[in-house]
Amino acid sequence: QAIVSKARRPYIL
């Protein structure tokens, strides 16, 4: 599941 933080940094949980 790809999530994008408020800093626009994509990371996978």
Swiss-Prot record:
Annotated compartments: Secreted
UniProt keyword Secreted, yes or no: yes
Modified residues (Pyrrolidone carboxylic acid): Q1
Gene Ontology, cellular component aspect: extracellular region
Swiss-Prot/TrEMBL keywords: Pyrrolidone carboxylic acid, Secreted, Vasoactive
Any single biological process term in GO: blood vessel diameter maintenance
Major site of localization recorded for this protein: secreted
Superkingdom assignment: Eukaryota
Function as written in the Swiss-Prot or TrEMBL entry: Smooth muscle-contracting peptide. Peptide action is not affected by tetrodotoxin, but is slightly mediated through the release of acetylcholine.
Family: Belongs to the neurotensin family.
Protein name in UniProt: Neurotensin
Species whose genome carries this gene: Rhinella marina
